[in-house]
A protein has these predicted regions:
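Flexible, acidic active-site loops/lids enriched in D/E/S/T/G that coordinate Mg2+ and/or position polar
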Residues: 9
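Cationic, low-complexity basic patches in intrinsically disordered or flexible, solvent-exposed regions
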Residues: 5
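Basic, polyanion-binding surface patches
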Residues: 12, 18-233
Length: 233
């Protein structure tokens, strides 16, 4: 796990056994930011990847992958992505999102994995990772930010809110989706065929994964989604 955990962090080594297995107890407050990140990123898995395009200096298309990402609302559709800092400074993506107020979340598939990984390398703000990796872009339609032509799914978003978290300057960016771009054949009966999408996900370290065998269970009865104040009593 890189730097060793201090004896203060590991409480009395192994604390005993549960169902015949040893359990390690680690005191979270004693961990360094790097140690915490390595633990959390290996525990919270698998994580989908938001491959985000933003507008950088001079209109250059900045491109970077982020795996602390989810959707937070369905009406209106909203996505959330956590973006940390490097040496206390905002990353290019966060800075561009705050400056322009819009961005595109592209969803890459297994064919694009090498490019997804390479786009995580750090470059000066004026460098376009899309150009560097020879990835074609298409003009945005609802916003000014371009999207990746090769991405099977792209979501044009306007920035909704930014919430700071923790002591290292991490911020949770929420964007409202204004336009969905979905490659023909991926959507069936209003749903995405995940197998055809073939998304990649992030796990701990420089490691990724693809979908394994799908396990289908019986459909459970659920109350339909509704809009607060309109469809609810």
């Amino acid at each position: 796990m890189g730097a060793k955990l201090s004896s203060a962090a590991v409480l009395a080594g192994f604390s005993g056994s549960i169902y015949g297995r040893l359990v390690m107890r680690i005191a979270a407050p004693e961990l360094t930011p790097e140690q915490t990140y390595k633990l959390m990123s290996g525990i919270v898995v698998p994580r989908p990847i938001a491959w985000i395009t933003t507008l950088g200096p001079g209109g250059k298309v900045n491109l970077a992958p982020f795996s602390c990402y989810t959707f937070v609302s369905n009406t209106p559709p909203m996505l959330g992505v956590n973006i940390g800092r490097k040496a206390g400074l905002r990353k290019d993506t966060a800075r561009n999102m705050l400056e322009h107020g819009h961005f595109v979340v592209n969803v890459g598939n297994a064919d694009l994995l090498d490019a997804i990984h390479a786009s995580a390398e750090e470059h000066p703000p004026e460098v376009s990772e899309a150009e560097l990796l020879q990835l074609d872009v298409l003009p945005g339609e609802a916003i000014a930010t371009p999207r990746l032509a090769a991405a099977p799914v792209s979501l044009e978003c306007v920035l909704h809110s930014v919430t700071p978290f923790g002591d290292t300057g991490a911020e949770f960016f929420v964007g409202e989706v204004r336009l969905f771009h979905i490659r023909d054949g991926l959507a069936r009966d209003g749903k995405i065929d995940t197998t055809l999408l073939d998304p990649v996900c992030r796990i701990g370290g420089p490691n990724y994964a693809r979908l394994g065998p799908l396990i289908t269970k019986r459909t459970l009865r659920q109350t339909p989604k509704s809009v607060m104040g309109q469809d609810t009593p």
